[in-house]
């Protein structure tokens, strides 16, 4: 389907549910002539046994509008690019309204900026996050809805994950790129519940140029970073040491903590480190 520069094209997708009343998340890959990397479109939704009132279908309320989740995932993006997602908002009240947005994070854009929503109806907004080289990994972006000219008492939170972009790297740059090497799973000595456990990973750069660690990120608030590095020279190693608080961990349960390093290694832009805690 050809379309000229500056023009827009529309892709219509119909999901035929055969899995029953469950949430669904499907991916459609769109390929463009002259581009190796496809555009991945995510189609998400929920299937219910029967129709529910909007107030229940969209249970997170900001005044008279409702969303399905309190934190909206925009998606993944590489530096120099943007990520977008379409979000459905519901006017669950019995009165029409106008919806606009204010106090948005600098990298966040919501379109349309102003729209009218009839009573008991839904509308769609396109949320776009623009990358920023000062922001890596998972970041929060916020915007406050304004309903009929009145600012909501709380903001809507969006998340996006940003990693390095290697699409503009030359063959020579890729040949001389840093290469990380590490053991990605650690099982520290078993501890009693409530005791602290420590884990240390050693990351080696076996490439030809410095390995940059843009960000060290945890999936748990039970982790404390004791030692890290922001750059590892070729041939060098660096230690990443963590302390784990185990007061909420359970015996015979999955007590795995995940650490993610965001790097400039084309083969491992994200390094996942797993700490598996055993409670006695």
Protein language model features and the residues they cover:
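Short acidic/proline- and small/hydrophobic-mixed sequence motifs that coincide with surface turns
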Residues: 23, 38, 94-99, 137, ...
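Short, hydrophobic beta-strand segments
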Residues: 11-19, 125-132, 240-248
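Long, low-complexity ectodomains and other extracytoplasmic segments of secretory-pathway proteins
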Residues: 34-83, 93, 148-202, 206-207, ...
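Short, solvent-exposed loop/turn segments enriched in Ser/Thr/Gly
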Residues: 18-27, 79-86, 132-143, 193-201, ...
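Surface-exposed binding patches on compact interaction domains or structured appendages
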Residues: 1-7, 93-122, 208-237
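Solvent-exposed, conformationally flexible loop/turn segments
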Residues: 6-8, 77-82, 120-122, 191-196, ...
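Beta-strand-rich extracellular modules
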Residues: 14-16, 31-35, 130, 146-148, ...
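C-terminal soluble interaction/assembly domains
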Residues: 197-206, 211-280
């Amino acid at each position: 389907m050809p379309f000229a520069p500056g023009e827009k094209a529309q892709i219509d997708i119909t999901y035929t549910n055969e899995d029953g009343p469950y949430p669904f998340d499907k991916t459609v890959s769109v390929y463009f002539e002259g581009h190796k990397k496809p555009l991945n479109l995510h189609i998400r939704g929920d299937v219910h046994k029967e129709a529910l009132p909007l107030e229940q279908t969209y249970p997170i309320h900001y005044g008279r509008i409702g969303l399905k989740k309190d934190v909206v995932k925009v998606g993944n993006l590489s530096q120099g690019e943007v990520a977008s997602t379409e979000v459905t908002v519901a006017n669950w009240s019995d009165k029409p309204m106008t919806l606009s947005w204010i106090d948005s994070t600098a990298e966040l854009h919501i379109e349309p900026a102003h729209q009218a929503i009839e009573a008991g109806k839904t509308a769609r907004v396109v949320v776009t996050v623009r990358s920023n080289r000062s922001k890596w990994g998972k970041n929060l972006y916020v915007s406050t809805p304004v309903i009929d000219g009145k600012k909501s008492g709380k903001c809507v939170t969006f998340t996006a994950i940003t990693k390095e972009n290697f699409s503009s790297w030359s063959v020579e740059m890729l040949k001389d790129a840093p290469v990380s090497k590490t053991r990605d799973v650690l099982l520290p000595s078993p501890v009693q519940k409530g005791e602290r456990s420590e884990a240390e990973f050693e990351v080696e750069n076996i490439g030809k140029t410095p390995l940059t660690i843009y960000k060290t990120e945890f999936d748990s608030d039970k982790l404390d970073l004791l030692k890290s590095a922001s750059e590892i020279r070729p041939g060098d190693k660096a230690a990443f040491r963590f302390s784990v608080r185990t007061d909420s961990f359970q015996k015979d349960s999955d007590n795995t903590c995940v650490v993610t390093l965001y790097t400039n290694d084309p083969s491992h832009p994200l390094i996942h480190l797993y700490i598996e805690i055993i409670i006695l």
